[in-house]
Amino acid sequence: MKHINWNTEKNVKLKESRGIGFEDIVFYIEKGDILNDCLHPNQKRYPEQRIMVIGINNYAYLVPYVEDVEEIFLKTIIPSRKATDIYFGGENES
């Protein structure tokens, strides 16, 4: 598996604002909780960028990334209600 990297400052901001960091994402990737992996829908603005959908505790997180021959670089972590409905059938709704 390729080395997974990220911006340290971005990681701190994500932990503070969203309660999840890139280390958590790597854990779930290694655990096999990738629900989908596709090209970013806006290739004009984000060329060569892909998005992993990671399932964590019945919730879907979108993780945009770029990959080269040496590494996978994670860009951000986006909790997604819409993806959760798609991949978990709205299980989180009370």
Protein language model features and the residues they cover:
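Ribonuclease/tRNase effector modules and their secretory precursors
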Residues: 1-94
